[in-house]
């Protein structure tokens, strides 16, 4: 099934759960870059994806949430290598279940102006690089998740629309002083 077809159905669509918590349970060390496991331990990543798909998730997020130049600084692998491996692992795990592989994109890890030093245009450029890598790797859709800055999400969405025709999902997290919504 194609992503566009999935979204035209009247049924509930289940997404996967947290990759980070599963990796921590598997022994991910503090300070490690979980996205590097796409290359160094693909079997672990595929196994986690397969568990979610077997449980009925129709959309599985690739292990690419932190794949940005800022967050991958010092990595032995390029952003493009990590995203390509992440999408490939996800697609292999999804195939037996007919689930879709989403390019999972999180915040860049830098604050945008005026609260930080990253210019809006530079954020659009960086998200464009991420989206192009996901498209080239064969992602079925894009999921922008856990954004707290509407301005940064706007940069991500503009980049996605400029560099892709894939369906897009987006989620935000807001604090209300008591809980995260």
PLM regions with names:
Residues 1-181:
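Domain-level signal for soluble alpha/beta catalytic cores
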């Amino acid at each position: 099934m194609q992503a566009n077809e999935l979204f035209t159905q009247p049924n509930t669509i289940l997404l996967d759960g947290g990759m980070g918590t599963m990796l921590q349970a598997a022994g991910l060390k503090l300070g490690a870059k979980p996205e590097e496991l796409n290359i160094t331990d693909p079997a672990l990543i595929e196994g986690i994806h397969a568990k979610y798909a077997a449980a009925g998730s129709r959309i599985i997020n690739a292990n690419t949430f932190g794949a940005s130049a800022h967050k991958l600084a010092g990595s032995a692998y390029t952003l493009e290598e990590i995203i390509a491996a992440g999408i490939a692992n996800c697609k292999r795990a999804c195939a037996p279940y007919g689930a879709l592989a989403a390019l999972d994109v999180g915040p860049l890890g830098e604050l945008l102006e005026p609260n930080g030093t990253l210019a809006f245009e530079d954020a659009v450029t960086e998200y464009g690089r991420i989206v192009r890598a996901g498209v080239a790797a064969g992602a079925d859709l894009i999921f922008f998740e856990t954004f707290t800055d509407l301005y940064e999400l706007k940069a991500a969405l503009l980049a996605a629309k400029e560099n892709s025709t894939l369906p897009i999902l987006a989620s935000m997290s807001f604090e209300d002083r008591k809980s995260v919504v």
